[in-house]
Amino acid sequence: SVDSWHTKAFSDVVKYADEQGVCVTIPSPGDIFSFGGASVEFLGPVQDYGDDPNEGSLVARVRYGETSFLFTGDMGFEAEDDMLSANVDVSATVLKVAHHGSAGSSSSEFLEAVNPQYAVISVGADNDYGHPTEAALNRLSALHIPVYRTDLLGEIVASSDGKTVTITWETETATREEPSQTADHYDYVGNTSSKVVHLATCGKLPGETNRVYFE
């Protein structure tokens, strides 16, 4: 049932929905509904993962025109593998990276299947879990997927006109350094023109005049 997972946040949502006379239902893979000019299709979970709320995360893809956005919750390798084994089409323009960039999510095989133009990691700065992990970031980097992180860039907005997606952000943490600085002293290097964040070890860093550095 919709109230079988007991957390305060979830209970508050169910309570508020009840107060508003809204019926809360559990979607199934294949369910589609319209949201303005967009459509939302639920792709997973494709298996019952019992009491594991992470692997049992809802997976949904929002389509608008020729663009799409994949939301993966906190799913891990097991749920990813099951979706791929079930031949679920997970391709998307933008991937919201699972589980804040956990080491146990975003396998290379899954990332290849999604083949996103952009990846967004929603994660708090200096969190206790060490997210996003170097393992997840390395897998994204190996496939040359541009990554945008809320802990480095603040609020991130992905806008679609139905044909292309534009990524913008608002941050107070990024500081522009003089060209004499080098990536050796930093963990991440941003491109002020393309708005892409690279690992400092990436072989495709922007020119010095287009760099912004993050520790």
What are these regions (language model features)?
Residues 1-182:
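Non-globular, low-confidence helical/coil segments that flank catalytic cores
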Residues 176-215:
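Mature, structured domains enriched in cysteine- and short glycine motifs
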